[in-house]
Amino acid sequence: MGKVLIAMSGGVDSSVAAYLLKLSGWDCVGATMTLYRNEDIGISRSRTCCSLEDVEDARSVAFRLRIPYYVFNFSDEFRRQVMDRFADAYGQGRTPNPCIDCNRYLKFRHLYDRAVLLGCDAIATGHYARIEQENGRYLLKKALDASKDQSYVLYMLTQEQLAHTQFPLGALHKAETRQLADSLGFFNARKPDSQDICFVPDGDYAAFIRRHTGKADTPGDFVDESGRILGCHRGIAHYTIGQRKGLGIPSNRPLYVKASDPKSNQVVLSGNDALFSQQLTGENFNWIAWEAPPRQFRCSAKIRYRQTEQPCEVTVEEGGSVQVLFDRPQRAITPGQAVVLYDGDTVLGGGTIL
């Protein structure tokens, strides 16, 4: 065992994780990251992730468990490494996953640095995933509760990070976590799970980007696959691949967003059939299962958080980019999202879809 810093959000998962670690003999320290103020993101009274109420919830659990507790202000880092990247990606016609950047830069970098300063040997979170050691490497594995598995948003973890990370909930089902919290008398046992992107709780990404960048939307043309103008769009940030709602284009067939081009400021619309493709290119890959991957191999790939993995063949190019050829065409492969590769319940690695 040793000393561990637990990332506590005020929710049931991180609270039970803290309890389990203390029960198993770890010297526990709790910490909550404050990432923004509601006023800074244009929200007046909405309860969001990392709100003051959540800080008090986490503090109450830490007090009940009799463990030290800290609050760390990472708002500058969050703005620079998560919010700015989110806004920039949408401006480039991509659809990012900010939870992955939050894990990469905040939880497993800045929070871990604080853990080291506090003399901790490891950090822990309430993620549903598992870490196992095999043949001298640390492997990231799916949680036993497939419906709550979060390995997709953890693909960026390095060997060094995996060696100093604990996921106490990886072998539990969510129902068991809530039952345990109930039995312990935790007041947050029935607290709802966080939903959507924490700093855009209303789901209006375009409005957030306007506030964050200070730039107004730039209207442009909707075009079909041949380039014929179909109408006017409100700004590229309003649209993502596969979207049908909110287009406002009269048509005798359903139309969907197929692509967006920030250079021409055009959004391409098509029928549903044109959204399917069998191949993608990924970049910035992090490999977990190997130091260096085979040049070609078969596995399964996931291209969005709640999707079931799909069988595919992978080719690793000389420069490090990755070609993924699916056995069957996939709908709405979206640039900016993560592609994560699996062998059964083991994460092989992952990267960003081009």
Language-model segments: which ranges?
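ATP-dependent adenylation/nucleotidyltransferase module used to activate substrates
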Residues: 1-155, 166, 175-176, 182
